[in-house]
């Protein structure tokens, strides 16, 4: 990765949930899900610089949030206890993934910090150990550590690689922030979808998102964005929202849709990835 003023830059890609079903509520209050997770090339950049004094410093936390509450800071703090030498790190986040969007930006940043510092600090954690550690930070973190398109079960921590056709995506971000906690506690949320017997990309179609109906009811702006995007093809919400997306087989088709919707909404044109960029490093 590139080096600037002693800082090294590492990618943190976004994700889309191409299908998301809630199969039950757990005794601990969390929900069991089944979902297709797909990596896309919309990404943040995480800049890291080693320190030898044991301090962890996040230089640009989200406005109003103490650095200790940021997932990237928490990831570094969590991993520090496994380090073989007393070392610290400075963190800068160049955010391109919108927040509160269902694209996993904060979780991806945290996963990138875990993956890089596991090597830098010679922690020696296996991928499974990193996934288990990442699950304590957020439900999407395990997927980004797994690093490949996947079918997820449990709370998102049981992952199996899934082949997903090469696609382009048009993503629309309505002007609203969806509260994930509000959606998961909503009395109208579907929580009893049947578990998949043979989960493949083809077998799970037509895709759906069990949270979509509740979000549309509580956040009309998401419904409006979905309705607009549905004019051009099959649209779906990712995660708990607020972003909605449609898939295309080629870039030209996606770009034509992007040109139309970007006049009305914050919009993104993204290409699907087969694996996390850090797996190539």
Curated annotation (Swiss-Prot):
Record has Protease as a keyword: no
What organism is listed for this UniProt entry? Neisseria meningitidis serogroup A / serotype 4A (strain DSM 15465 / Z2491)
State the protein's purpose.
Catalyzes the phosphorylation of the position 2 hydroxy group of 4-diphosphocytidyl-2C-methyl-D-erythritol.
Task: Tell me what this protein is called.
Answer: 4-diphosphocytidyl-2-C-methyl-D-erythritol kinase
Cross-referenced Pfam families, in alphabetical order? GHMP_kinases_C, GHMP_kinases_N
- Pathway connected to this protein: Isoprenoid biosynthesis; isopentenyl diphosphate biosynthesis via DXP pathway; isopentenyl diphosphate from 1-deoxy-D-xylulose 5-phosphate: step 3/6
- What range does the record give for the signal peptide? none
Q: Which PANTHER family match?
A: 4-DIPHOSPHOCYTIDYL-2-C-METHYL-D-ERYTHRITOL KINASE, CHLOROPLASTIC (PTHR43527:SF2)
Kindly give the InterPro entries that the UniProt entry links to this protein.
Answer: GHMP_kinase_C_dom (IPR013750), GHMP_kinase_C_sf (IPR036554), GHMP_kinase_N_dom (IPR006204), IspE (IPR004424), Ribosomal_Su5_D2-typ_SF (IPR020568), Ribsml_uS5_D2-typ_fold_subgr (IPR014721)
Alphabetically sorted, this entry's keywords are: ATP-binding, Isoprene biosynthesis, Kinase, Nucleotide-binding, Transferase
Provide the binding site for ATP: 98-108
Q: Which reaction does it catalyse?
A: 4-CDP-2-C-methyl-D-erythritol + ATP = 4-CDP-2-C-methyl-D-erythritol 2-phosphate + ADP + H(+)
Molecular function GO labels: 4-(cytidine 5'-diphospho)-2-C-methyl-D-erythritol kinase activity; ATP binding
| Name of the coding gene | ispE
Q: Indicate the residues that form the catalytic site.
A: 15, 140
Q: What enzyme class is recorded for this protein?
A: transferase
Gene Ontology biological-process annotations: isopentenyl diphosphate biosynthetic process, methylerythritol 4-phosphate pathway; terpenoid biosynthetic process
State the similarity comment. Belongs to the GHMP kinase family. IspE subfamily.
Enzyme Commission numbers on file: 2.7.1.148
